[in-house]
From Swiss-Prot:
Any GO MF annotation of the entry: phosphopyruvate hydratase activity
Sequence positions that bind (2R)-2-phosphoglycerate: Q174, K346, R375, S376, K397
Domain of life (superkingdom): Archaea
EC number: 4.2.1.11
Subcellular compartments: Cytoplasm; Secreted; Cell surface
Pathway where this protein functions: Carbohydrate degradation; glycolysis; pyruvate from D-glyceraldehyde 3-phosphate: step 4/5
Annotated source species: Methanosarcina acetivorans (strain ATCC 35395 / DSM 2834 / JCM 12185 / C2A)
Name listed for the protein in its UniProt record: Enolase
Protein family (similarity comment): Belongs to the enolase family.
GO BP of this protein: glycolytic process
Annotated catalysed reactions: (2R)-2-phosphoglycerate = phosphoenolpyruvate + H2O
Length: 429
């Protein structure tokens, strides 16, 4: 991680000359923040995503709460914070000193969850600073982040069927994903995923009608289904019809269980299940379908239940998203307990590039799988693609192979693989 090894000596060529933020729209038509950072030698632009189902322990995304603009979701306060408070403190600093800049912004905020300046303000600047540094050094972002060790392409875990908060159907589980882990290259993996996606669309239209191919926030189909097994059967059918086997393409679930947890019970498939019953339910699914990973299978504070499922399904990837919120303190607790065995890394959950790297490093040191992730409300920003390669993430989760804000990330990974040439290595799970 080149930008994290000590402080760089001052050089006027790399000093921040100007920072400018603006309000733009995300993929759900809501405002978000975009930040430009200028140096004499380079330029960086970054825009910040937003989640639909969010963990209560995430860093705070600052919204205006003005009902007369965008239903209260404007971000002009966050924009102003960047253009005044943050810019004033960062002008003249060396963009190569990422950690120094991130820590200064965190100190300026003076809260645990970045609620004064806003995690969206801080993250927008943090990402734009990194991009400006890479551009100033005439270096690809993945190489700037990861140095000579950045050559691994992650397995895409593609959300092709949507439920929960990402769709308007009755499926409790939020995401049903395909994982082309048997591919030889990322290029091939993307082709496999796209082929299955289109076969699935035809299957759904034939069985459920044309409206079943309407898509959710992340590009996945949102058919009128009510039970998880119905969705899983459709995925298995599509994988087979596309000409692939269960060893080549596995299935991932994002339960987002906090969203269907109520008064110590989980409402799923028309049933009200206690945690031990839900655990048995997941075990049955894994025994019946080629499921490789389950994300957020329980309520976000249920560390003990995560631990129990991780022990029960020891060869399944149990992912902590709302459980960990990319926070090293919560991740440390999970590691100590053996709760989950994978980290979902979302930079906007924690609010800075440096802290995201810290979480990824802790996860990897402790044998956890790292999955870099988008959010449901995205932009065309591709920073997470470079980040995934830089940290050697085993997987990347950035939606279906559809919708421009999703394919932007996949297409960036294709470019990186091409740039790496023969040294590129596609992860083998």
């Amino acid at each position: 991680m080149m930008s994290y090894i000590g402080l760089q000596q001052d050089s006027g060529e790399y000093k921040i000359q100007k920072i400018h933020a603006r309000e733009i729209l995300d993929s759900r038509g809501n405002p978000t923040i975009e930040v430009d950072v200028f140096t004499p030698k380079g330029f960086g632009r970054a825009s910040v995503p937003s989640g639909a189902s969010t963990g209560t322990n995430e860093a705070l995304e600052l919204r205006d709460a003005d009902p007369n603009r965008y239903g209260g979701k404007g971000v002009l306060t966050a924009v102003k914070n960047v253009n005044t408070i943050i810019q004033k403190e960062l002008l003249g600093l060396d963009v190569r000193n990422q950690r120094e800049i991130d820590e200064l912004m965190i100190e300026l905020d003076e809260t645990e969850n970045k609620s004064n300046l806003g995690a969206n303000s801080i993250l927008g600047v943090s990402m734009a600073v990194a991009k400006a540094a890479a551009d100033s050094l005439n270096m690809p972002l993945y190489r700037y982040f990861g140095g000579s060790n950045a050559f691994t392409l992650p397995v895409p875990t593609m959300n092709v069927l949507n439920g929960g908060k990402h769709a308007g159907n009755e499926l409790a589980i939020q995401e049903f994903m395909i994982q082309p882990k048997g591919a030889e290259t990322f290029y091939e993996a993307l082709q496999i995923g796209a082929e299955i996606y289109h076969v699935l669309g035809k299957y759904l239209e034939k069985k459920y009608g044309r409206s079943s191919t309407n898509v959710g926030y992340e590009g996945g189909y949102a058919p009128k289904m009510s039970e998880s097994t119905e969705a899983l059967d459709a995925l298995v059918q599509a994988i087979e019809e596309a000409g692939y086997t269960e060893s080549e393409v596995t299935i991932g679930l994002d339960a987002a269980a906090t969203e269907f947890y109520e008064e110590e019970f989980y409402n799923i498939d028309g049933k009200k299940l206690a945690a031990p019953e839900l655990l048995d339910y997941y075990v049955e699914l894994v025994n019946s379908y080629p499921i490789l990973s389950i994300e957020d299978p329980f309520y976000e504070e249920a560390f003990e239940d995560f631990e129990a499922l991780t022990n029960e399904l020891w060869d399944t990837i149990i992912v902590g998203d709302d459980l960990f919120v990319t926070n090293i303190e919560r991740l440390s607790r999970g590691v100590d307990m053996g709760a989950a065995n994978a980290l979902l890394l979302k930079v906007n959950q924690i609010g800075s590039i440096s802290e995201a790297f810290d979480a990824a490093s802790m996860a990897s040191r402790n044998g956890y799988t790292v999955i870099v992730s988008h959010r449901s409300a995205e932009t065309e920003d591709t920073t997470i693609s470079d980040l995934a390669v830089a940290i050697g993430a085993e997987m990347i989760k950035t939606g279906a192979p559809a919708r421009g804000e999703r394919t932007a990330k996949y297409n960036q990974l294709l470019r990186i693989e091409e740039d790496l040439g023969e040294v590129a290595h596609y992860v083998q799970l």
